[in-house]
A protein has these predicted regions:
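ER/Golgi luminal nucleotide-sugar-dependent glycosyltransferases, focusing on the catalytic module
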Residues: 1-176
Length: 176
């Protein structure tokens, strides 16, 4: 797929995200169990959304209670939608930063705003679908490995434990 074909395909599309990954547990529970994540942080963000953006609460409940998660903060949006999303997202994260107590967090845990932003993208996309009728397109996510050994390991892992499979969820659940 060349740049010309990609630009042609994107013409008129308001929002494109990677395909969600079925975690087989709720997005909320997955967040709380994931390494370097704290459930209290997501709970605080939920409170902030309820206070600042009550019209987003139904989408937030639907997304966080569902099992399909959008990882990576990856998206393509038309500029007006992108501007709206950024205003919404950063107002929530700025309020989170004012209220949150991250004392004692490791360097990895201090990436909390990025972890939360991944979940908030899902909330925003769900809100778009529910309230505006915006068609959100999902494409497979591609990950390039710079090292052949890592590529072989990932290929093997994905063959044994396909992303979104119950087996993979079971193994992840056992670790968390």
């Amino acid at each position: 797929l060349g740049l010309d074909r990609l630009e042609q395909w994107l013409e008129g599309k308001a929002c494109v995200v990677p395909m969600g990954e079925d975690m087989h547990i709720s997005v909320r529970d997955h967040y709380a169990r994931a390494p370097y994540h704290h459930g209290k942080d997501l709970a605080l963000v939920e409170d902030i959304v309820r206070e600042k953006y009550p019209d987003y609460v139904p989408a937030m409940e639907e997304y966080l209670s569902g099992t399909n998660c959008y990882f990576g903060n990856i998206f393509i949006m038309q500029k007006p939608l992108f501007d709206q999303y950024c205003g919404w997202l950063f107002s929530i994260l700025e309020e989170f930063d004012r209220r949150a107590d991250t004392t004692g967090y490791s360097t990895q845990e201090l990436r909390v705003d990025g972890y939360l932003a991944e979940r908030l993208l899902g909330v925003y996309v769900t809100h778009l679908r529910r309230t505006t009728g915006t068609q959100v397109y999902e494409l497979p996510r591609v990950q390039f490995e710079p090292d052949n050994k890592k590529r072989v390991q990932r290929t093997l892992l994905n063959a044994l434990l396909p992303p979104g499979s119950r087996r993979r969820a079971w193994v992840k659940k056992g670790r968390g």
